[in-house]
Amino acid sequence: MAIVSAIFSVMLIFLIIGTIIVIIFDSGDSATKIAWLLIITILPIIGLLLYFMVGINLRQSRYFKNKHKKFIDIFGQRANAQVHKLLFGHEKDHRVKKDYRTLTQLLSCDGSTRVTDGNGLEIITSGHRKFELLMEDLENAKEYIHMEYFYFRHDKGAQQIKEMLMKKAREGVKVRFIHENIANIDILPGYYNEMKKAGVMVEKFTKPRWPLINLVTQLNYRDHRKIVVIDGKIGYAGGMNISDDYFVKWRDTHMRITGNAVAGLQYSFLNTWITADGEIDDDFAKYFPMCADVGSAVKVNAEAARDTDIDLNEEDSEGNGIAEVLAKTPIQSLDMNFKFKNKDCLIQIVPDEPESRWGHIHMGAVWAVQHAKKYIYIQTPYFVPPEPMLQALQSAALSGVDVRVMVPKKADLFFMGPANRSYFKECLEAGVKIYERTGRFIHAKTFVSDDYLSEIGSANMDFRSFNLDYELVAYIYDTTVANVNKAIFLKDLEASKEVTLEDWERRPWYQKFSQRIIRLFAALL
């Protein structure tokens, strides 16, 4: 036994040393590496197991590169010149304000899609409204439905959508459905088998061939997107999953898009679908119709947006009257539906994946903060900013920019509350204003600055979204949309409490202790 114990100890020491060397030479950020070194030092065996399960950096791994190359090869073979021009043409960049054109270049530096025009946009802040719109659009689908969700809960609303997908598949509509594997691990295979029997093509993300790779990739690299594409003409994206939580408990922001930007959503979906070994048709042209009949209105739908429609007149065509109208709306209802006639939004769809070399969403967010001159309003459920983002927020506030960050008062995950709050002091000392929203859990992932730039998507402001998960964000270059998002943020302030530095310094010792402990591992959350 003594010999066996000695051999085990020697092997463990060599394994620890080897792992430490791998971590040190990893290309990831310093905060993540320090966190892993700390946990391996304190708890060697548990730390090693966790690192090999969820810590290995596969951003530049051969596995992900090969998967992405497969999609690029297929897309290159099957997509015609018109599709390439729609997705990657530079023709519309000149319509973006001059100060923001370098951002459009940054966001497309690794083959992502460019700016598109001819888009209609509907901003949805109500789970009920999103459900109604989606069900109606699914019912009217003629050729295909492409759906990709992080959470697809086994509840009443999800069951109705599932039944609609099966109904359309039986009618001959091609229905492709991707579900994130680990996030929906509690759903039994029979749930999806029923969909398959009805003709729905179902794939899970991801399903590598080898168990060890399966363990690593599924636990740490997740498909966090929420995308729907219907007939290539209507698309949905944003923060809302398929769950009854959005009917009552959660406040989120989502988009319904018509027009050429839908091609960007389609491109992202097909990438994930082919990566998951999904079956696809040879004719790619039908997936990217040149939408001449795009929506001509920008709408903002909030809670129960059925009865009250407000058309802003030409004097208010920039959306300046929205704040005044929302000011009269109870925070519990937000039941206005704003229509902006003859709008033509400039939208750039930005997907990000572990195999992306540069991390577009993180870089784009940092750029947007660094270049803001008047204000920055951010909503995020998880506020664990990497060092570049934290410094950008501090620099902006110290430069006189009105920087406001809204997070939930009570997090949905027990460790995320202390994690969020562990960054408050550094932000407050620099002049960043922090607000905690009470009541409904704020799950929105939005950014708006200087009455022009808006970001709406699936990415949180944390290490995971910026480095590990498959995410998608829409960058919208439009004054009206920016004013809408600003007004929604200001309305949410009515259900929020500002955190002051004085109050923060007086918090109990046990909160300070828990926040400092969680902060050590923030990069791993």
What is the predicted function of each stretch?
Residues M1-M363, W367, H371, S395, ...:
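N-terminal localization/anchoring segments of enzymes in phospholipid and broader phosphate metabolism
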Residues F150, E180, P381-Y382, M416:
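Glycine- and other small-residue-rich loops at beta-strand/loop junctions that grip anionic moieties
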Residues I434-T438:
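Active-site donor-binding acidic/aromatic loop of nucleotide-activated sugar
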Residues Y382-V403, P408, L413:
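Helical hairpin unit composed of two closely spaced alpha helices linked by a short loop
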Residues K445:
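Catalytic-core elements of nucleic-acid end-processing and repair enzymes
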Residues E387-Q391, G417-A419, S449:
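Histidine/acidic-residue-rich catalytic or RNA/ligand-binding cores of hydrolases
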